[in-house]
Amino acid sequence: MSGDRKRVGFVTGSRADYGIMRNFLKLLDEDGNILLDIITTGALLSEKYGRQVELIYKDGFHVSAEIGLTLDSSSNEKVLFTMSEALGKFAAYFNDNPYDLLLILGDRYEMLSAALAAAMQRIPILHIHGGEATYGNYDEFIRHAITKMSRYHFTSTEVYRERVIQLGENPGNVFNLGALGAENCLQMDEENVTGEVKQLEKDQYFVILFHPETLTGTDVVQQGREILMALENYPDYKLVFIGVNADTDSDLIRGMVSGFVASHKNAVYFENLHTDAYHYLLKHGICLVGNSSSGIIEAPSLGINTVNIGNRQKGRVRGESVMDVGWDAAEIKAAMDRAIKKHGSIGQGNPYFQEDAAKNYYQKTLELLSRVEEDRKEPKEFYDLKVMV
């Protein structure tokens, strides 16, 4: 540690979670009393995913470690092997790097390994986006498990704050500060967007981003077929696909999308996008089609509709701009047609938005850092609710 500076770490394994945290991280990084380390892992370091860690270097952050993992998403068993590898590597890293506070966002399987390693080393964890529900994916139980390993919590709605408390967390350590992503997308730097993304004709394309459902038993190939069948109905619009994550069976989706793009002149694929470029695409598109959480949390702030497919996001609080459909080509097409008719008229109501979210995250983190040494002297206790069921 350098002098009296508080040492804060942030573990990131994907383009998405880094993008959500970026503005908040900048505030921490600019604070002379904080030494911020970015600990990278997972898909960020993979050549297959475009080595997205370069986006972090480009933004000027200090990357303290690149914890490489063997990524094989062909089965849940292979994902578990990756988690085991991650646990060992994070255990060694945290043994040598005893942070005052570790920031963990969300529910990725790599984050579960990082959280367990940190908790075993008695490193206090601040968990962001806890309490949420996503019944179609193993993120659901991973998220709640990380909550129990964490001492502090920033939730994105009051409903989620109450759920974290229901899990036995002390209300004095659980804060509803809104979702960073719901604010970040309104602060994009359009001057930072160049190339093929900037050349797309505004309001003449769909953004497509979909990931596997890992808990419902729905066939991933059939999911892909249904959405691609629906997209066949829009030859006069550009179809802009965004790279899939590293969940189980994601390579099957990637292969289907690659084949579709190769055979359709109106389709393009971006594996690796800077946060500003992604938000630019959303802002100027007709709607987001797929099952990404950004369609629930970020797209409403930008005033565009979301065609949310399947059960991956089932359980999340959502605004009126989100249209839920099943894995059926006809349903998907009908919702996309409604999105075309409604385009530009939905307003910007978003249940996840709170003004000055990044600043509020920063100020609350300073408050936590001022008491973390005293807090960690005592083991975290289970907070019992005075209710009978």
Predicted regions and their residues:
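A nucleotide-sugar donor-handling region in carbohydrate enzymes
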Residues: 11-12, 44-47, 149-222
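Active-site and donor-binding regions of nucleotide-sugar-utilizing enzymes
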Residues: 7, 11-12, 18-31, 69-171
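A donor-sugar binding/catalytic signature common to diverse glycosyltransferases
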Residues: 104-105, 112, 127, 153, ...
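Conserved nucleotide-sugar phosphate-binding/catalytic loop shared by glycosyltransferases and other
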Residues: 35-79, 89
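Catalytic binding pocket for nucleotide-activated donors in carbohydrate/polymer assembly enzymes
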Residues: 297-345
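Short acidic-hydrophobic, aromatic-tinged amphipathic segments that line or gate anion-handling sites
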Residues: 67, 155, 175-177, 269-271, ...
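C-terminal amphipathic helix plus adjacent low-complexity
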Residues: 340-389
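Donor-nucleotide binding loops and adjacent catalytic segments primarily
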Residues: 56, 191-286
